[in-house]
Amino acid sequence: MSGKSLIFAVQYLRSLRGGSQPILVRASDGLLYVVKFTNNLQGPNLPFNESIGSEIYRACGLPGPRWKPLLVSDSFIDSNRDCWIQTPLGRLRPESGLCFGSCFLGGQGNRLLEILPATSFRRVRNHDSFWLAWLIDICAGHADNRQAIFLEDGAGWLDPFFVDHGHLFGGPEGGLRRGFLASRYLDPRIYQRLTSEQHLAIRKNAGGLDVDQLWKGIEALPHDWKTTSALSEYAECLSRLSDSKLLQNIVDTMLCTLARDNGLERLEPQFGRKPPVAVLRPGVQATKLDCRCVA
């Protein structure tokens, strides 16, 4: 996990956008963190989903902010009522204790972009990382669109960082099932045509994860983050990532769907074989991901 030393919130800065109503704080290590409370309105599995999702992405080499369990004290909550959760019935006091905290990427004058104009897509580095992220999200039962922010460097290039994993593993309450298209990035222009080498690398990366080590990683999480439904959904995710044939089927479905929707070139010259008539095979159906694609 991301660090072992305990840190705690020392300064409330502001509330942020989002269904989980996160807040921005300065922590005892001097850094800024986006904090999500355990009793957020989205569901009890959110801290688990955020932390384990970050760990899977890190294991795949996908960029994202570092995270840590962050202690929020009763005195901090009571002295900063602006951080309380807004509900239709009024303000709800956040629960104290260990919360999910991810390092804030917007400090030190960094220019961050959430939505890209059409002219900016050519400036994005690592387009293929979005394909790998989509594959991981499908295996993890992501029930929402993939979120990413883009950090602009001095030369104008944009580096993607993947954020907001709270809807992995069937969502913050668990058990939510959506079609596999629900988990892709909203603007399909980010998915550029893959070379055969990139195609193979994506499957190899996802299929090469040490799932035993990933499972052991949950031991470091706070006990109350590990709900029964979250653990069950996570076990299913690791099972999918261990099935090489299933991964191939999912990748074929992804490629077929984007080629159909975007009018991309057919796949024969790209991969040296015809796309399957029905990419979805029984193995994919068994994942209950509701993937459908007909070439």
Language model region names:
Residues 113-174:
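Conserved kinase catalytic-core segment
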Residues 71-72, 145-150, 206-213:
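A general structural signal for short secondary-structure boundary/capping elements
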Residues 107-121, 190-194:
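Short secondary-structure transition/capping segments
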Residues 2-113, 137-143, 158, 165:
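Conserved ATP-binding subdomain of kinase catalytic cores across diverse folds
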Residues 38, 155-295:
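C-terminal catalytic region of ATP-dependent kinase domains
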Residues 41, 45, 127, 226:
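Conserved aromatic-histidine-acidic binding/catalytic patches
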Residues 1-11, 284-293:
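N-terminal intrinsically disordered, low-complexity tails enriched in polar/charged
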